[in-house]
Amino acid sequence: MVLEATVLVIDNSEYSRNGDFPRTRFEAQIDSVEFIFQAKRNSNPENTVGLISGAGANPRVLSTFTAEFGKILAGLHDTQIEGKLHMATALQIAQLTLKHRQNKVQHQRIVAFVCSPISDSRDELIRLAKTLKKNNVAVDIINFGEIEQNTELLDEFIAAVNNPQEETSHLLTVTPGPRLLYENIASSPIILEEGSSGMGAFGGSGGDSDANGTFMDFGVDPSMDPELAMALRLSMEEEQQRQERLRQQQQQQDQPEQSEQPEQHQDK
């Protein structure tokens, strides 16, 4: 499993209020941030994740590298939806954050959400892409919401940041539809190349062989049908929780009966 430090960059611009992705573009990112965080941690327990907001007056670091999702969640709760996306600045801050990671053995990766029109110039972004490539920083971009305006430029950016011998950076373009944003991410190379099926992310077991084997017993390949795999996992977890509740209820019922027995002997 790849050992990585990952910086997530969220787009908290005014465009993130739009409701074409349930419930809004911003809330779709929150669900996806949790999904990616868990997938990274499940892929390798020594992976760490940081968080940056890309819009507002200036991009800012919401959480330094951590293995605790609570710190990421606190950063998300402190985020305000405002202004426009400063993509180049946010990526530069992410690169600087990666440079100061504690574990220098960790590979460097940025995962950026883009759901608003990019205002940075093409030349500026291509120069930045080449700098990131030179410093061995991989970049994944989740492009949604304003894809007609952004896709061509983001294609060029990813082409510039990628190493031809090893394409470690990816562009995922998502259109509105029945699948949630994180479900599209789950079946993309952003997650699948981590050595995790992605469906273990919310379940906490991380694409282990037992879980995948269970899915295969149902005739489901998690990498091919992540939505069905997720539904099966949730169903199995609910059944496990139901059985656990029944077991606890049975134990509670047995305890009073056991405590009453000595009293009956004393009366006799």
Swiss-Prot record:
Location of region: Disordered: 226-268
State the UniProt keywords alphabetically.
Proteasome, Ubl conjugation
Residues in VWFA domain copies? 5-190
GO MF terms, alphabetically ordered = K48-linked polyubiquitin modification-dependent protein binding; polyubiquitin modification-dependent protein binding
Q: Where is the composition biased (Low complexity)?
A: 248-261
**What GO CC terms are in its UniProt record?**
cytosol; nucleus; proteasome complex; proteasome regulatory particle, base subcomplex
- Domain (UIM) ranges: 223-242
Gene3D superfamilies (alphabetical): 1.10.287.3990, von Willebrand factor, type A domain
Q: What does UniProt say on post-translational modification here?
A: Ubiquitinated, leading to its degradation. Ubiquitination is promoted by HUL5.
Spell out the Basic and acidic residues composition-biased ranges. 235-247
Other comment: Present with 17200 molecules/cell in log phase SD medium.
Describe the task this protein carries out: Multiubiquitin binding protein.
- Protein family (similarity comment): Belongs to the proteasome subunit S5A family.
Q: What is this protein called?
A: 26S proteasome regulatory subunit RPN10
